[in-house]
Every structure is written in C-alpha cells, then in structure tokens.
C-alpha cells in the first residue's frame, strides 16, 4: 500500500515559501552560525537550506516550534529515534526484500528476505514504542505516532509477524543434509545424491583414520546402504593442500565433475566455502523441502506490496532539530537565555500581519562567537505593529546599530524555522521573506560604482518584496555625499512606507530621522498605508557605548568628537 510521505518540517507540503538569498543569510550571520552546528558540510548545508525557506503560513511555524520543544526536552527520545531511523535507512539502502522479487529464488534467499522484513517490522515496533513512551505534545510527533500505527495496520504487520514466527519454527529444523556417494571398482565416484535433510547438526568426531584406514578395516564398512543416523563426522577443507590429493578428495572431485557433466551440481571453486556449499546444495534442498519453499513463497507473495516507506526522509529533518537542540542546550548551560517563539494569533475582530513583540533579545553571534561585544551583551526590546512599521535607527559609530539590525533578522529566521530565539520572549506574525541591503563588497561595485550598485540592488529588492516582508538596511546610500545620499534615502523610506513592509534602516544620516513626521504626514494624506516611520536611537553613556535602543528623536550628533578624544586624534592632541 502506498503511503504519503510524512514530514516533521512541513505539515502541508503545498504551503508556499520564499527562499532567502545567500547574501541575506550571510548579512545576518546565519551561514557562519549554521557551520557551528555540525562538523559535516553536508549537514551544515541542509540546515542552512531549511532555514532559508521562509514559510509565511503561521501553521508551519507553530508546527515546527512545538516539535523543536519536544526534541529539546526529550533527549532520550531524539537519540532513540535517530538510532531506529538509521536502522531503517540501512535496510532500505542495502536490503534485498525491497528489490524486485524473484520467483525462482532458493530457500536461503527467501529466508533472508523474510529476516529483513522481520527486522523492518521490529524497527516500526520500536519507533512506535519510543513515541508512546515519550512525553510528547507537538502535533508533529503525535502525528508521526499515528502515521507509524497506520503503517503497521495497513500492511498487516500483526499477521505477518505470526506468519514469520511459524515459518521460523519450521525452517529452524533445517540443520544439516546427508549426501551419499557411490564408488566404482577404481574408487571413483559413480554417483552422488542427497540422502536426507536433517533436524540435527553433525558434530565433529575424534581423529579418524584416512580413507585407506576405512577400507582396510572391514568392521568399518557398512554391509548395506541404510544410514544408521550417526551424526558424528570428520570435517575437511576441500581446498587445503593436505587433503587435495587424498583419495577422498579425488572421489569428491570426480563425483562433482560427473554431476556437472550431467547438468547437475557445479564444482566448488576456490574461495568462500560456506557460500559455495550453500549454492551447491540449493537445488537439492529446494527439491526435498518443496512444501516448505512453497510456504515461504506464499508468505512473501502475500506481503509483496510491502516496501520500506519513506520514513527515512525523516532522518535529515530530525537531524535538523537535534543539531539545533544540542547547540542551544550548550549555550543555555553557559548562561545564555533562549525562549520559544509564539506565533501571533489574531483576535476575533482584528488581525495584525505586522505584529512583533521582542523582549530581551540579542544577536546570536554574540553568544556563538567571541567578539568585543560578547562580554557585555545588552538585551533589548522592540515592537512592530500596524502603526509602527519603519524604524530609522541612528547612533554613534560602533554603537551596536548593525548588531541589533542583524538580531531582528535572526529572530524571524530562527522562529520560522521552529528554533528557540535568543531572548526572553518573541511574539510575531511570520514574514513572507527577509531582504537585506548591506554594504556590498568592493569587487561587486566596479562596474556601477558603489552608489550605483546600491541603487540598483535596492530597486530589485523593492520590486520583489511585499507588505509582509522584512527589510533590513545597513548604512544604505552613505557612500556618496550627504546631500546625494539623503535625497535617495528619503525617497526610499517614502516608498517603503507606501508598500508598508516592516523595516529597520540604520544610518548616520540623523536628518533622515528628524524628517519622519514629515514623511508620515505625506503618507497619511495619500492614504497609502496606516503604517508610520519612527526614530530609534542607540544610547551612549558619555563616550561609552550602552548598546541600548529606544524609540526617541535623534540626538543629532555622531559623537565623533568624543571618540576622537578617546583615541587621541583631535587636532590639539595630535600636534601638541
């Protein structure tokens, strides 16, 4: 029976998404952070690719957030699940029963296929037991539990387990076979055949004489061909030099060659004797226990539609959650604060697709990497809503403007990926995409010049973004004169207000922040949107950076004189 794939990442495989560009992931520092989660490049790339897919559907975010919480809190469950799924993956990749079924297969192949099928059932059983024994609450894992139960029921595993058990009881009686060889007057094999299939193993006897001892002593020669049910035997290596020239070996060789000439049993080649002996006896055993072979084939035909389902696709998905859980647990043990994001639920009378309430947030890079700011992480609060749509962020050089701008982008990437966010709380409406307009590398601006490249890139971003996107701008249009940069920047903010997307624009152009009221009035008159722009500042404590942000009018200076004095580069300090 065909089973639809189950996913721990996508409750609805038809949900729409937008993929963040590599540039955006780099601007937010997420590419470097993902490299910290695993030493394997393949796993790093998979995790980054998952995070780059932004699903605006709140149901996807909630689904992931709940699953991650279960994974984070249930260490034993996540370890057990990975072990079970890897066993299933091994069966799927290297097993034989999932390949084309051969009706002419011998008893040994048939039993091997049954064993693999039995192993798969055990894995499904273990998967269900693991989920049933874990304290899970997410719809994703509860759904997986139901999915496993459905696989079990739909494929008739309970009946199959019974059939396999009964077959095992029958086939377990096959312990050995007895071969008879007729000799002519020259002690050459005149015929070879199978006498019986036995329910006992032959056991090694004491040291016996060689072939001449047997024929020299009449009391060791049976008077008839009736087998006395003696299970003692003397094993010999058919390829060993010591026995290669013995009469018994010659008898065996002659018998095999004669049988071969009659289209019967082929001669045993050099190599793995156990495997060759099995192949040597396949046809004879199949004939003598034809009823048992028929029974095994009937069971396999009954369940021929069973295939290892695509549960193995859950392995990288589970790995995604596990790698993040392990890393965040490590950071939590070091004292960093993380919290589960909450998807904004619209009220009965109104909804706010622009809503974001972030409390005590910080840039994840400060926890992951050892930087100048890492030793003094300052948590911040920030809100977006239907009214507060654009922030013009100003403050001193190296005051933390870029750090907080990155942090907001990271919040959405992490939360919509289901991962705990760095901070105390985060309630939000998911974005359709994130766009960054950060300074470009010099080698990318040679053709158009830096300002030309910035303008072209902003136009492309603006055309692709929509009202539910997040736009993060870092010192945009500041590479030219103040007058030119200000003119372009102001028109850009006006256009952003027109579209209504959530935006943080950090800049040294304090005049742009002073003009927010003028731009807001213009937009209100045009009735383009009900969103407004606000001035936000990064506080300074004298010449010391506080990294604390606040919605407030710009302070109108960049603290250049204080910084110059701190580093001794004022005119007076330089020429004294």
Where are these regions (language model features)?
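ATPase nucleotide-binding head domains, primarily ABC-like/P-loop NTPase cores
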Residues: 351-576
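Structured, charged N-terminal subsegments at the starts of enzyme catalytic cores
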Residues: 188, 194-278
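Charged, amphipathic alpha-helical oligomerization/scaffolding segments
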Residues: 112, 119, 126, 176-178, ...
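Low-complexity, highly charged intrinsically disordered N-terminal segments
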Residues: 305-332
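Alpha-helical initiation/capping and key positions within long helical/coiled-coil segments
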Residues: 112, 306, 310-313, 450-453
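Extended, charged coiled-coil "arm/hinge" scaffolds of SMC/Rad50-like chromosome-maintenance ATPases
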Residues: 270-301, 308, 315
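Conserved amphipathic alpha-helical "coupling/scaffold" segments
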Residues: 1-204
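Long, charged, glycine-rich C-terminal linkers/tails
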Residues: 179, 325-363
């Amino acid at each position: 029976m065909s089973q639809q794939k189950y996913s721990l990442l996508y409750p609805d495989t038809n949900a729409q998404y937008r993929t963040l560009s590599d540039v955006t992931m780099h601007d937010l520092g997420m590419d470097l952070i993902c490299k910290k989660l695993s030493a394997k490049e393949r796993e790093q790339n998979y995790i980054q690719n998952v995070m780059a897919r932004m699903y605006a559907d709140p149901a996807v975010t909630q689904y992931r957030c709940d699953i991650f919480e279960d994974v984070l809190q249930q260490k034993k469950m996540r370890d057990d699940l990975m072990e079970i799924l890897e066993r299933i993956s091994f069966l799927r990749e290297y097993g034989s029963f999932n390949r084309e079924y051969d009706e002419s297969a011998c008893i040994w192949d048939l039993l091997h296929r049954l064993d693999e099928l039995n192993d798969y059932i055990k894995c499904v059983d273990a998967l269900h037991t693991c989920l049933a024994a874990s304290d899970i609450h997410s719809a994703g894992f509860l759904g997986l539990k139901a999915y496993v139960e459905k696989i079990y029921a739909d494929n008739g595993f309970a009946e199959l387990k019974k059939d396999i058990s009964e077959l095992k009881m029958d086939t377990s009686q096959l312990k050995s076979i007895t071969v008879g060889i007729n000799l002519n007057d020259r002690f050459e094999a005149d015929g070879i055949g199978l006498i019986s299939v036995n329910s006992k193993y032959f056991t090694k006897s004491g040291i016996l004489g060689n072939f001449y001892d047997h024929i020299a002593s009449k009391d060791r020669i049976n008077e008839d061909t009736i087998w006395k049910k003696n299970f003692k035997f003397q094993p010999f290596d058919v390829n060993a030099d010591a026995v290669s020239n013995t009469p018994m070996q010659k008898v065996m060789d002659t018998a095999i060659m004669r049988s071969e000439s009659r289209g019967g049993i082929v001669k045993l080649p050099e190599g793995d004797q156990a495997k060759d002996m099995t192949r040597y006896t396949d046809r004879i055993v199949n004939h003598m226990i034809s009823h048992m072979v028929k029974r095994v084939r009937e069971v396999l035909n009954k369940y021929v539609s069973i295939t290892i389902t695509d549960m193995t696709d859950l392995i990288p998905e589970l790995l995604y959650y596990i790698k993040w859980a392990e890393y965040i647990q490590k950071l939590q043990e070091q004292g960093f604060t993380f919290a589960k994001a909450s998807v904004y639920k619209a009220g009965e009378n109104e909804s706010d697709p622009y809503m974001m309430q972030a409390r005590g947030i910080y840039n994840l890079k400060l926890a992951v990497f050892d930087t100048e700011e890492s030793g003094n992480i300052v948590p911040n609060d920030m809100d977006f809503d239907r009214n507060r749509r654009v922030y013009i962020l100003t403050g001193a050089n190296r005051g933390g403007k870029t750090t907080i701008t990155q942090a907001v982008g990271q919040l959405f990437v992490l939360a919509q990926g289901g991962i705990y966010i760095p901070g105390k709380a985060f309630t939000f409406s998911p974005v359709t995409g994130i766009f960054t307009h950060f300074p470009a590398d010099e080698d990318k601006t040679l053709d158009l010049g830096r300002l030309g490249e910035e303008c072209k890139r902003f136009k492309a971003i603006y055309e692709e973004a929509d009202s539910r996107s997040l736009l993060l701008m870092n010192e945009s249009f500041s590479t030219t004169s103040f007058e030119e940069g200000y003119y372009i920047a102001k028109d850009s903010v006006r256009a952003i207000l027109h579209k209504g997307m959530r935006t943080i624009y950090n800049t040294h152009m304090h005049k742009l922040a002073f003009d927010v009221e003028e731009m807001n009035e213009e937009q209100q008159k045009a009735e383009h949107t009900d969103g407004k722009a606000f001035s936000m500042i990064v506080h300074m404590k004298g010449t010391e950076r506080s990294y604390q942000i606040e919605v407030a009018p710009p302070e109108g200076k960049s603290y250049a004189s204080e910084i110059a004095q701190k580093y001794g580069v004022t005119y007076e300090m330089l020429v004294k």
